[in-house]
């Protein structure tokens, strides 16, 4: 096809018109093509893919296909080039009969996303059908007496084509008797007739042969012929005549058999048999008409005898003959046109042309799910079909084309709420009463990974006993995902982190599918009390979603640590301790104190002490405190007692089963004058340089005790003056022992009552006021220590960097140990509230700090309180421990500083009360007096690291 373009304004107008037309066609989603009928296979129709705006490469992936109701196979599309072509023979007369318009309606459907395009292919008529007469020969009998201009009806020809191709012209072969009458303008009347132009004479021409030719208007012209054989008859001059030559009748479809259509009436001017008329159908009518109607030969009534269906035929033409009974019968003719009226007798036809299922729950609004075709064989209002959808569903019907509806998404979907919809589409016509049809479709909602796995609670607490076997199952986490299939497959994993210096995965693991949590190694309560970690649950969707849950695994203590004795010094052999006791001591004199710690917690760390019976069943004058570990005399010593005693002290915890440790104490009874000359802390079997050090220490201790005595006297005098000068401050109760302990960080006092100030009691200094140095330094450093004592009191010290918690001491902070001495213990564990002694400083300031009791003291750490120094000092961090701390029930301070193996024996580990010790007390008490005076003036400071 070639186009020639003009110039100027006309060209621009034409181009604009074509663009507007193309835009209108694209907006309606409809294309129009035309093709001639009887086109050969492969005939080009149109470039349908290009006209629809589709790329050739996407035709196959998007499942490009063509659908046509009842017209399948006539047209096809080449998916390689997108061309619509003729696939099989197209016969317009077969498709549309004699309809003026004939089109093939195609639906072009592509998926991903679903789109529907409507294509109309007009079938152009060609002149491929010649005119056809009902018969090839027609016989007519005409009396010679018929007058001129008599008319004899003929059945015209029919042409299956339309338009000019079906426009017929007739011509009669040349003759002198008859001429041809043109058919009337009424298109329903197809007949024509012969007009007698010259009188007939049987004797001259008994038979006349004529040829009637019908020619259509096509190019080239096609013709059809019929031979007319006219026989000339004698007699009977008048033929029957009907009232009208054409009758028109309206008849409803579906009327019952026997319904009267019309009653015809013909008359004959003759008399007798020549005037009797017999009615019949012409031989030229079709068998279909004869099967639908019947005529009574006497009355001329036409009645229904077959099923009348408007959808089958909208009208019927009946040719009726009236023939008289003369010897030479004459006939008259008329035409009856029966127009069938439509009745609403057909239900709508509903069909799903294409379904795009299932639909994703995140599909956008307006997504086309299905294409629905509706039709009704009735006409007019009876054939007007409307569709409706089930209410309260997130879908709607949209009319996209004549008799086509699209099922589209109207609101958001949520598969977790509704996973499938049962939709019912109802098609209803406009008749009265209306008829309807329904069709149902199940729409499944495809899952989208829009829900993360969820745990029942955000945190779980798990209790696991320590020393569990490796691979032990300790807990199971479970998460639920509201999605389906792969999106609901949950896998579990650890959120990796560091636990101390080790990775979390070295402690626990989680099974990816079951969620079972396993302990990979035995857990140790003393090393790790709480293991807190997170487990991630992640689904298998794309992209995957996940959530976390926190597990707090508390490691429960088991009695897996035996009590550990605190050795008097590092490198001591055998744990045996030698003590020198004067013969003159009385009842209750404390000989020594056995100290032990247990790395466990609770009852497993609650220690008790028992004195094992001696060999031979001999009674010994000693006992041990059940919970204090203090070895004291049970009576006054006499000469019947053995001079040497080997005491075995059994230290036992309260676990199940109980674990024990044994301490050996060697007690030697000496005269009072000999006691200072012997070492009260020598180990059994000590020889060599150790013995020489003991002799040197004796002289140093004597010197220190002398100085201490002066300090004690000064302190007593000062205290007496204070008590007499300030009577309102409260008197000191006689006999109430007060312990003042001085150390490098200040002075601490211990009493069973809280007092605003420290004052000495009445009675001997040994029982009223005792001052001790927490430890004796090496002889080479003792003079330096005496010189720096005052400086230590005046300025705070930094935390001692040369000590750390041991595992046993850390665990000891969780022990629950009760004291039995000095009215300290009131109830056992789990019983009523316990009254514990309070260690407080001499300062009266209310803002003094508080800390927990010292580790290893055998006292519940929740019951003791230290108060010392002004202000609110910093609390100790984990792993920090003061250099020295006080053991209740014993005038001593434990030092846990690690000393070299060759250092002086630690005098604070095991304590005796000989004269040598009394001398030391006096010296230390003087230092304590000075310290207390500084505290009362508010000038003392406390080291924060000793909390």
Curated annotation (Swiss-Prot):
Pfam families with a match to the protein in the record: Cadherin, Cadherin_2, Cadherin_tail
A GO cellular component entry from the record: plasma membrane
Database matches in InterPro entries: Cadherin-like_dom (IPR002126), Cadherin-like_sf (IPR015919), Cadherin_CBD (IPR031904), Cadherin_CS (IPR020894), Cadherin_N (IPR013164), Protocadherin/Cadherin-CA (IPR050174)
GO biological process: cell adhesion; homophilic cell adhesion via plasma membrane adhesion molecules; nervous system development
Residue segments, region 6 X 4 AA repeats of P-X-X-P: 734-891
Top-level taxonomic group: Eukaryota
Entry protein name: Protocadherin alpha-4
Organism: Homo sapiens
